[in-house]
């Protein structure tokens, strides 16, 4: 089993993860992605062997999942639900394993490139500027910055909120911590300056950038997915990333470390939004109709958006230009072949309305 785990864990070296697929994939990347899917399936299978049936958790766009202690302890931050769950199946001193994981999770920094979410390496370091600072408060209502306060809170949680459940012959011990009610806003606030800079650089509305970030990752800088998207705006290295680099006169594709850097990720994602707006979908005259098309294309590609209206790109733009923006929205949310893309437009458009009101 250790050999299989080792095989699964080389996946990040082969290809990065993601949630959406663009139009410009090359054959080699498709092969890499298929291989990555196989490796991730094996990784999930081995986690199931260790934790038991229905106990597989793997990091995703809105879920930070980190295994330690030979995969016997894990930290799970659900950025959508606003919960942190620390669990262990360690047979000896489970409270000690939970305490250490609680402290490190509460005090970890915001450098995704330093943490391997696909190994049990003890690579989560305590930061002077914890990523979760202000998103979690202790039993006295105070935010947690220092190790002493985090340890005291961990002991309090172990005394008052420790739970256990059985799965086969395994006992799973867990502690759940709720993030503060406005945790989403607190995370978004961390990136407002970077968003404003990218907005001015590329001429993309700040509210749209923030809405894309919320929908893609819930402002999780550790965001990964199984199809090759990385970081806050879930940029795909070999499609959007490559297109942006080419437009900027750079060769190759952005690296994992580049896209895990929040500022670089936001810059690249915003540059791609500008390309969709000004180049790929620039033939759409009405700015509202074009915005609906750009949002949908960020998820499923510009080609798939135009093909909803016609197989001919010029004719598709002409048809869109003959329609009212509301009809374009209705068409994209009901006739786009991808259910994910149909829902994506609704989610981003709704989120953008909230950011526009601020």
Curated annotation (Swiss-Prot):
Membrane-protein topology: Lipid-anchor
Lipidation positions, renumbered (S-diacylglycerol cysteine): 17
A GO molecular-function annotation: peptidoglycan lytic transglycosylase activity
Localization of this protein: Cell outer membrane
Lipidated residue numbers (N-palmitoyl cysteine): 17
Gene3D superfamilies per record: 1.10.530.10
EC number: 4.2.2.n1
Function recorded in the entry: Murein-degrading enzyme. May play a role in recycling of muropeptides during cell elongation and/or cell division.
Protein name (database record): Membrane-bound lytic murein transglycosylase C
Organism in which the protein naturally occurs: Enterobacter sp. (strain 638)
